Amino acid sequence: MSVSGGNFTEISKDEAKVADKNLSPNGQYLLMNKPVHVKDVAGKDIYKDLPKSDAYVYTSLDYRHWDKYNDGSYNHVFYKDTKTGAEIDITPGQPYYTPQAPFGGDEDYVWDPKGENIYYVSKKLAGTEYAVSTNTDIYKFNLADKKTENITEENKGYDTQPAFSKAGALAYLQMKTPGYEADKNDIIIFENGVKQNLTSQWDGTVNGFLWASNNKDIYFTAPVDGTQQIFKVDYPGKTRKMAVVEQLSQGQFDVTGIVAENNGQLIVTRTDMNHASEIFSFDLKSKTFKQLTQVNNEFYGKLDLPTVEKRMVTTKDGKQMLVWVILPPNFDKNKKYPTLLYAQGGPQSALSQFYSTRWNFQLMASEGYIIVAPNRRGMPGHGVEWNADISGDWGGKAMQDYLDAIDAISKEAYVDKDRLGAIGASFGGYSVFWLAGNHDGRFKTFIAHDGVFDTRAMYGTTEELFFVNHDMGGAYWDKNNATAQKSFKEFNPITYVDKWDTPIMIVQGGKDYRVPIEQGLGAFQAAQLKGIKSKLLYLPEENHWVLQPQNALVWQREFFSWLKETL
């Protein structure tokens, strides 16, 4: 499709190869990745005479991740000769992942412009060390001598997304704080043996980036004020000039990715709460967008869409908090509407103009509900301090932010204060469980999906231990750690179950190893034993998300059925 819009045309395989970043500059090799068996942990591998065994034997952590148990296989990068088909593993026999588990892709490896080296991301730690660390590094593998060099050894946090300019400068993303998965993400340039942080003085965090064709600028996306926008930072090179960050776009939408640059335009993907992702061009001179695809326009034309309003609410401690308020289609301010407080997960995930097929505000509003979606403490896009202000304080300021938001919006005459509900997943589910014991009668119903019910049990069963170590402050057995003890007692939802008295629906995935099954089952069991109206939606084959289409439809039907019944 032309960057000016128009019809689609199918491209050939040869044309696709030209655009394939995994093809070496001279066309001789193709980068690829696949799982390689490195360790024997399955019973049938340890005991060859027991081929039907489904047992596993572990002596350290990293025994499961996201929704899979470790079977002794690790993703490795290979370069394949395009003529002979020969494949060479660049990390043979090593128990390390590239791409990174569980979500990494080919952004984790790249050719240098000369095709002499492969740069790749790996966390070269195993077992328990792997589970408690975020220390991924970027490695350089030389094709000639087969030697590997760690080029980010000095940094003990995340190093990710290596990408070269055509002039040969390497850019990548870096988080400095060990074990902190939601730290400020900076753009680092490595050229001629010198590293330069381009965004250190900017009070934000980078999502993804693209080198400009001039080799001097980098375009990137970042959360800001409840949206995701396009930014530019210049690369000063050998000069002593300070790099300058400039916001290029603004509006009530999310720019979710930068695909390419072409003739003074960026090709991007963009979405908002009422519209699924489409492809746009962005003119770098006029700072304007042009929509190139209209995949769903036929459907939107048949719908009455909700209204999304941006509000600012003063918190109890005097801060200004952005709150999205989604009003039903054909909203009438003279009517009263049941209202839902939406609690975002993460906890350090942006509550921006996203469009979800599950937590879809358009569907909720179309069923006659107002949705209140606060950018509470812990969310990026409001400065590094606001983002960090939830770590070690899950049940503190963030929970008060939720109460401040719903109390402020409930003052509107069109909000039915006798019909308030609270809903959320992951940390949002934790928030619902915590509010269930601390809401002072505000809410008439709750829905918690894969939420943390017992922080102590969570510490003992979740797989990414670096997360709970940082966000909860440490281990529950460390009696001298005041932050940890607060997380496992005062900020633990299970502490307040004696105050539960409100109907609650609980959703739990059977293969959710991030917030494992005992969390949802424990909450449902407590509600049942207390005689509280409650429902469990159990999804045995789903992980932390609901991915199977018919399960997603069951989720939607049960969600709205519960609200209709209890609100």
Regions inferred by a protein language model and the residue ranges of each:
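Residue position within the beta-strands of beta-propeller blades
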Residues: 29-33, 117-121, 169-174, 217-221, ...
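The serine-hydrolase catalytic nucleophile loop
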Residues: 336, 347-361, 376, 518-519
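N-terminal cap/lid segment of alpha/beta-hydrolase-fold proteins
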Residues: 78-80, 294-334
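Predominantly five- to eight-bladed beta-propeller fold
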Residues: 35-83, 87-93, 121-139, 287-298, ...
